[in-house]
Amino acid sequence: PSEEKNQDILNIIFTNKLTCTFDENDFRYHARALVGSNPIIISTTGIIEAPAKPKQYYLDLMTNFSKEEIEEIKKKYKGQFLEYGDSRIPDIIEGYVLQAIFYYETGDAFCDNNQCRLFNSHWQKDLFISQLGNKKMCKKHEEILIKIKNKIA
């Protein structure tokens, strides 16, 4: 709607398309779960594909080329990374929505504390800690959230 075409309203787009950004430092594209702007884009495919799976998983895949062996490797690591249709995805999306709100309100979506829902997880195991294991924000970001709520109220 035309009344929402301004920077005073946060718009979040959810897509199943893989979003990427180009890094000038290494001249590569990197998959992203969240692309910060307004509108902010949250990619459900990016949530699954962007954070890396366990290192040993990739090593096992590189040394086993048959289709049967690949299926065995996937079984071996089942539960250690997200898959399409995974029942944990909605809980993880909540954390990305929080990151989107913080990016819009403060210009900074992420936290260095892996116990905070705003942690920028580069590995699936870290994603599970910050988004599923703890499901809370650190004290610093909890205080900022209270200020944001008070500003809106």
Explain the meaning of each model-derived region.
Residues D108-I152:
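Post-HExxH zinc-binding segment in Zn-dependent metallohydrolases
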Residues P1-N114, L118-H122:
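Metzincin-family zinc-dependent endopeptidase catalytic domain
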